[in-house]
């Protein structure tokens, strides 16, 4: 079994391309089902954030898995596959596993060490698990990636003094206005996590008036209440736009929230007063043409790079330590993955032993005549103990040999000596195989 990945991120594609391939939370289940139906796909997870869209596929052949990934991404994008391919990267098993671990640890983020991505990795896995598109290999891989991400944050200072995208947006506004945010009016569009963080950072920086607008007015009211702001209905957005000096927008909408003509009317209503628009949504919330208007400065998520350089050197030192953790956790996963071929033989051996045990217990109980329930349980327990003890050493030694040349010899010997009928499909999600240090996957 192999794991492959394909996708694009902030390093390979600008936001104008990334937004073409972004998946909203509610769109993930049907997308996962479509991907699972691709030829050669045994399991799949889709990770879609503001900085990346990646698909991870468990497959029996790497070439088939990568082909399925590219076909799916091509059909899911508004661009032709030929145009999209220049922005895509494809990763085979070794690179895909290490890449996912680095993503979970925040090492592949635009903001080195940022912590939001770990929650996004966990959510992507949860959605795929609930949709039923994961398998044993992906379950183990994702759980190990999340564990690795937590280890990195616990054992290093990778997230010390780091900044979030929301914080970077506020810092950009502070720089543009030369640290003079006092008395400014800021309109925040959206009431999700990033918008909430932005609103709180704004208050911390001295902004006196924060307007909050959201598709759900109740959520806008709730956020406004926590920061002493004012809630604005989304359909009344244009009425309040002329009051704003800064607009920060981050919604999950699949279409523009602010169009050029709306911004033009707001600017006309306040001649000579500049308007700063910061769009940190993917897909973008603000029509790019709005940035061409006189007096308007429009920034998108890709423009935040200059802000995230703060405190980078300290986090780079932590990143080097984190790479060691990633290497160790990835190697543990590769060992587990490399041992999977022995599992069908172990299952077949246990099943044959269990069948023999059950038959002999029934025969013994019939010969002994009337037995109490307690006596039957004692006989069954004794037979189970004998079987487990007889098989224990063989199974332990087979697992230990799985990563050596002897492993295949042991498998063939057991299958021939015990005349096992082996199902070569992989074990189910609950089958655990321990291969090192007592860690169980």
From Swiss-Prot:
GO biological process: protoporphyrinogen IX biosynthetic process from glutamate
Further facts: During catalysis, the active site Cys acts as a nucleophile attacking the alpha-carbonyl group of tRNA-bound glutamate with the formation of a thioester intermediate between enzyme and glutamate, and the concomitant release of tRNA(Glu). The thioester intermediate is finally reduced by direct hydride transfer from NADPH, to form the product GSA.
Known function: Catalyzes the NADPH-dependent reduction of glutamyl-tRNA(Glu) to glutamate 1-semialdehyde (GSA).
GO molecular function terms listed in the Swiss-Prot or TrEMBL record: glutamyl-tRNA reductase activity; NADP binding
InterPro entries: 4pyrrol_synth_GluRdtase, 4pyrrol_synth_GluRdtase_dimer, 4pyrrol_synth_GluRdtase_N, GluRdtase_dimer_dom_sf, GluRdtase_N_sf, NAD(P)-bd_dom_sf, Shikm_DH/Glu-tRNA_Rdtase
PANTHER family reported for this sequence: GLUTAMYL-TRNA REDUCTASE (PTHR43013:SF1)
Family membership noted in the UniProt record: Belongs to the glutamyl-tRNA reductase family.
Pathway per the UniProt entry: Porphyrin-containing compound metabolism; protoporphyrin-IX biosynthesis; 5-aminolevulinate from L-glutamyl-tRNA(Glu): step 1/2
Assigned EC number: 1.2.1.70
Keywords: NADP, Oxidoreductase, Porphyrin biosynthesis
Site residues (Important for activity), renumbered to this chain: 99
Matches recorded under NCBIfam families: hemA, PRK00045.1-3
Record-given protein name: Glutamyl-tRNA reductase
Organism: Moorella thermoacetica (strain ATCC 39073 / JCM 9320)
Binding site for NADP(+): 190-195
Origin: domain of life: Bacteria
SUPFAM superfamilies reported in the protein's UniProt record: Glutamyl tRNA-reductase catalytic, N-terminal domain (SSF69742), Glutamyl tRNA-reductase dimerization domain (SSF69075), NAD(P)-binding Rossmann-fold domains (SSF51735)
Free-text domain note: Possesses an unusual extended V-shaped dimeric structure with each monomer consisting of three distinct domains arranged along a curved 'spinal' alpha-helix. The N-terminal catalytic domain specifically recognizes the glutamate moiety of the substrate. The second domain is the NADPH-binding domain, and the third C-terminal domain is responsible for dimerization.
List of residues binding substrate: 49-52, 109, 114-116, 120
């Amino acid at each position: 079994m192999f794991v492959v990945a394909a996708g694009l991120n902030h390093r390979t594609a600008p936001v104008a391309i990334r937004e073409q391939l972004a998946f909203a939370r509610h769109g993930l289940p049907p997308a996962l089902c479509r991907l699972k139906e691709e030829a050669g796909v045994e399991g799949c997870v889709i990770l879609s954030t503001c900085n990346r869209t990646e698909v991870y596929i468990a497959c029996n052949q790497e070439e088939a898995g990568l082909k399925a990934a590219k076909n799916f991404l091509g059909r899911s994008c508004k661009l032709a596959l030929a145009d999209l391919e220049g922005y895509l990267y494809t990763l085979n098993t070794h690179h895909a596993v290490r890449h996912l671990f680095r993503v979970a640890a925040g090492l592949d983020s635009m903001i080195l060490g940022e912590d939001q991505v770990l929650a996004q990795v966990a959510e992507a896995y949860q959605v795929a698990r609930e949709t039923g598109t994961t398998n044993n290999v992906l379950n183990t891989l994702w759980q190990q990636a999340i564990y690795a991400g937590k280890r990195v944050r616990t054992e290093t200072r990778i997230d010390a003094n780091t900044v979030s995208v929301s914080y970077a947006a506020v810092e950009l506004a502070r720089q543009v206005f030369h640290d003079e945010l006092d008395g400014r009016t800021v309109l925040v569009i959206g009431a999700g996590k990033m918008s909430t963080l932005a609103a709180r950072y704004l208050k911390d920086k001295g902004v006196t008036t924060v307007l909050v607008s959201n598709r759900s007015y109740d959520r806008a009211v709730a956020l406004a209440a926590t920061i002493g702001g004012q809630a604005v209905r989304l359909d009344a957005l244009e009425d309040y736009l002329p009051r704003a000096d800064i607009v920060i927008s981050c919604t999950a909408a699949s279409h523009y929230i602010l169009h050029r003509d709306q911004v033009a009317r707001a600017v006309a209503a306040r001649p000579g007063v500049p308007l700063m628009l910061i769009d940190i949504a993917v897909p973008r919330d603000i029509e790019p043409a709005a940035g061409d208007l006189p007096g308007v400065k429009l920034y998108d998520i890709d423009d935040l790079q200059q802000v995230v350089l703060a405190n980078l050197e300290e986090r780079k030192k932590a990143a080097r330590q984190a790479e060691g953790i990633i290497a160790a956790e990835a190697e543990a996963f590769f060992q587990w993955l490399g041992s999977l071929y022995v599992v069908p033989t172990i299952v077949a051996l246990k099943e044959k032993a269990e069948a023999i045990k059950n038959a002999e217990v029934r025969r013994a109980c019939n010969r002994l005549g009337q037995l109490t329930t307690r006596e039957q349980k004692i006989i069954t327990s004794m037979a189970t103990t004998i079987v487990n003890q007889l098989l224990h050493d063989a199974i332990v030694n087979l697992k230990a040999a799985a990563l050596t040349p002897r492993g295949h010899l042991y498998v063939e010997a057991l299958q021939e000596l015990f005349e096992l009928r082996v199902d070569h499909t992989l074990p189910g999600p609950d089958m655990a195989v321990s291969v090192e240090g007592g860690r169980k996957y």
